[in-house]
Amino acid sequence: MVELGQINRPEAESFSGKRKLYCVASIFSVADAPADYTALVDRYWDEVSRQLEKLESAGKIKKVFSEIIMEQGDESLDILGKINERVPQLIKKKLEEGGVLVPLESADFLGPYTDWSNCLRVVYTREVFQKVFGFYNEVAEKRLGHILDVIEKNLSEAEAGLLILKDEDRVKLQFPKDIEVFLITPPSYDDIMRWLRERMMKKNEKD
């Protein structure tokens, strides 16, 4: 697994002929988010775009995989845009440069996964939480298995792909050994994580 700093031409040549997957953490803001957090998220996606351009010296992106996307076309991108408006912009740019959008999700798993995830947010009793978490965990594992299968079957030899997925999901994926994984972690990523930790600490202090 490669942490992106800066890959120069000799290093890029060492990845020639290998399957490559450029992984970007899906980070988004919400309508009522504080201005400083929204600014951090915007800076994050700007930096991601610049780092991807540098990284593509190791291989131009030919396949694009993104969470939420269940089918090709503008409709799926519009749905994704309601959650994270910066991701469709990045995807469209890569499609214009010759990439192909590959549906990553299955309605059989994404729907139940979302429902059980929402249920976990409103459960109060330990007994019910354990039951709901069991259902959630079961469908979450099936969803991740499907995601891994889609990438394995659609990323061809010597191709480079872009994966946009929450970090907590990505770390659970066991990619085949012949896929070289690159993690895109611009400076603003750490700033966002720090912002979220401080926010949580302040909330806990109030509680």
Language model region names:
Residues 1-207:
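Compositional signal for N-terminal targeting/processing segments
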